[in-house]
Regions:
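Alpha/beta hydrolase fold serine-hydrolase catalytic domain that processes acyl esters and thioesters
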Residues: 2-283, 302-493
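Gly/Ala-rich beta-loop-alpha elbow adjacent to hydrolase catalytic centers
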Residues: 287-300
């Protein structure tokens, strides 16, 4: 049976600037009336003057309509890969215009001498000029100012050590017992992805991570399986794998998960007897899903002495990390699904900013929740298994070389290993009595971090080509009609 060809080149993601905003509006227009109706029905449920049974029916109907809209919108974005990129670009354009207005207003205040305390002059250089930076900065500053994003000090604790007796450690007061079953050292890259599948269900307060020490002496290396975002609420919790960490990583700021990953690696090395001066020289392979891929790229984008760990290899699955340029000596394989919207949340086109090897896979839409299926860690585990099978059949090219380099981190038969599990959690800061403006101004900047730029993505105009020859004047409409009719007449001679 002949296989149906699959489209691999997604122009809407590669060159999103070639698509007008009207294209996005026409695609999402079918859900707008249903969304408005859902909001109206939901408003009826909040009217206290209505009978309780009417409000209950309205509430139930609103929930059902919301579920239907969610399924329909997921199908639209799944069937048209790249709409997510256009959506982020549209939001970035709005944020850029807002930042431009704010910059002009601040300059006016400074120019007329109304800036008595000088805070406008101090804030003016901090207003981003790029749309995506303005969008992320606005979300972080507003969330911090209103007290929603209040992540504090980061803590780590050992959950299990295969070299300890007993292996499982007693949970800390107030912490539930971790549900961990995959305790063996991984043998393949897909095993690390499968470990992430289980870590999502560890039932700990913060994310659980799995660290495997492979080999001894100069051959010693470390494997780290890292989960993605676990808390999608807009208010900080004790789980640092949240929205605040995502925003801070996009802006190149220090995040709770980055700090936690470095601390758990240092704790594992300390338990294994590694001298402190070697902590930044021990090679580490990080397999990260979603947010975990961003954390891995962020740690690999700076020198090992600055990051605190030596990230030598990355396997990123579904991570929006194209804004981060990793070091040239880091072997990176980025796996993404064509229908997964999460890798496009960094606002960048589908291109590689460095020497990473990118791998894509086109999925078949399931019956329900297609976007969840496209971003699921278990779906990516299946994709990595297919990828391993592919490079075994065709062991040549950049992809096979990169996969072989990452596979070299895995333990050889009979090589000693040690498996440790850690938990990362954070404190919640108490809102201070400072004013909103002071809280926003106190946000630190990203040091020497510079996001990867795609110059064509910011091109506003294209050079106009010179006219080669004067266009020929077209005949009038009556003349063209008579000429067409004359050609249809029969020859009566």
């Amino acid at each position: 049976m002949k296989r149906r060809p699959r489209q691999r080149y997604r122009a809407i993601r590669r060159v999103p600037q070639a698509y007008p905003g009207l294209y996005l509006r026409l695609k999402v227009a079918p859900i707008v009336p249903a969304l408005a109706a859902t909001v109206a029905v939901g408003a009826l449920a909040d009217i206290s003057s209505l009978p309780e049974d009417v409000r209950a029916r309205a509430r139930t109907l609103s929930d059902d309509m919301g579920t239907a809209i969610s399924e329909k919108s997921q199908r639209i974005f799944f069937d048209t890969p790249g709409l997510d990129t256009l959506l982020i670009r549209s939001l970035s354009h709005v944020a850029r215009r807002t930042a431009t207005v704010g910059r002009a207003w601040a300059r006016t205040v400074v120019a007329v001498g109304a800036d008595k305390d000088g805070r406008m002059a101090r804030m003016l250089p901090l207003i981003p000029r790029r749309g995506y930076d303005a969008l992320m900065t606005g979300m972080l500053t507003i969330g911090t100012a209103v007290g929603a994003l209040r992540g504090g000090a980061v803590h780590v604790a050992l959950l299990r050590d295969s070299a300890a007796d007993p292996a499982f450690q007693d949970p800390l007061p107030g912490h539930p017992e971790a549900q961990i079953r995959r305790v063996d050292a991984p043998e393949q890259l897909s095993d690390m992805c499968a470990d992430i599948d289980e870590l999502y269900w560890s039932r700990t307060i913060g994310p659980a991570v799995k660290i495997t020490r492979v080999g001894e002496g100069e051959a010693r290396r470390w494997l780290l399986s890292l989960v993605g975002t676990e808390s999608m609420t807009w208010r900080s919790t004790n789980n640092p794998a949240d929205v605040e960490t995502n925003i801070r990583l996009m802006l190149g700021l220090e995040s709770a998960m980055s700090v936690g990953v470095v601390r758990v690696l240092h704790a594992a090395m300390e338990r294994d007897g590694v001298p402190t001066e070697r902590w930044t020289r021990e090679p580490v392979l990080i397999c990260g899903h979603s947010q975990g891929g961003i954390v891995a790229a962020a740690l690999a984008s700076v020198p090992a002495d600055e990051a605190g760990v030596n990230v030598a290899g990355i396997l990123s699955t579904g991570g929006p990390n194209r804004r981060i340029r990793v070091r040239p000596d880091v072997v990176t394989v980025a796996v993404t699904h064509d229908q997964d919207v999460m890798p496009s949340l960094d606002g960048s086109p589908d291109r590689a900013p460095d020497r990473r090897v990118t791998v894509g896979r086109s999925l078949v839409r399931p019956r329900t929740r297609p976007l969840y299926y496209a971003h699921s860690s278990s779906t990516y585990t299946e994709t990595v298994r297919l990828l391993e099978r592919k490079v075994r059949v065709t062991p040549w090219g950049r992809l096979a070389s990169a996969m072989a380099a990452l596979q070299d981190f895995m333990p050889a038969p009979g090589e000693p290993t040690r498996v440790m599990h850690f938990e990362i959690w954070q404190d919640i800061l108490t809102p201070t009595a400072e004013g909103t403006w002071n809280t926003v101004a106190a946000l630190e900047r990203g040091g020497s971090y510079e996001p990867a730029t795609y110059h064509i993505d910011y091109a506003a105009t294209a050079p106009r080509l010179p006219r080669i020859a004067r266009a020929r004047r077209r005949a009038s409409i009556p003349a063209r009609l008579s000429s067409a009719l004359s050609s249809l007449r029969k020859d009566r001679s």
